[in-house]
Amino acid sequence: SKDKLHTLYKLLCSFTGGQSIVFCNHRESVDRVAAYLREQKIFFEAYHGGMEQEVRERALYKFRCGSSNVLVSTDLAARGLDIPEVQHIIHYHLPGSEEAYIHRTGRTARWDADGCSYLILHSEERVPEYLTTGVDDYLLPERAARPQPPLWTTLYIGKGKKDKINKVDIAGFLY
């Protein structure tokens, strides 16, 4: 488990940009990976069905608008989400079926964009039979710098018309 976490960290550090989704099979695994990435000072958002709806929506919003470059999720994020420009799909756990693999990997390379899918395998795990072609080893660099923080920050203001606050007030405050 620690080996896979360290491998995930090195893999994320090897990317020179772009957004990544890390897929885990269980909510507890998402929480464990999130705790590790937090320790390593990686900017990320977690997303799974055990979270409150509002928290999940904020996580997706931050990921979509570029305030976070990594989304750690269960298969909840594998279907029905419209997230353009995801360049890296990381299967921290092997998907349970070929269909799950297809849906997870389908989050990248959308609309003629380029993208890659990565499997992090423990020494006792093997590449699934449905992936017998087109699988290459990815050699991780010995040393790589921690990923840069996102260029954007999301500012959430839970106020609106009822509170007599509008866009101009916020823009004036930030300027």
Model-flagged regions — what are they?
Residues S1-K4, H26-V30, M51-Q53, L76-R79, ...:
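Conserved nucleotide-binding/hydrolysis micro-motifs of P-loop NTPases
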Residues L140-Y175:
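Non-catalytic terminal extensions of ATP-dependent helicases
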Residues L12-T16, Y36-E39, Y61-C65, L81-D82, ...:
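Conserved catalytic network of the ASCE P-loop NTPase/AAA+ motor domain
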Residues S1-Y36, F173:
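Conserved interdomain hinge at the start of the Helicase C-terminal
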Residues L60, V70-Y92, E99, W111:
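P-loop/Walker A NTP-binding module and the surrounding RecA-like catalytic core of P-loop NTPases
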Residues V70, R79, S97-Y138:
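Conserved segment of the helicase C-terminal RecA-like domain
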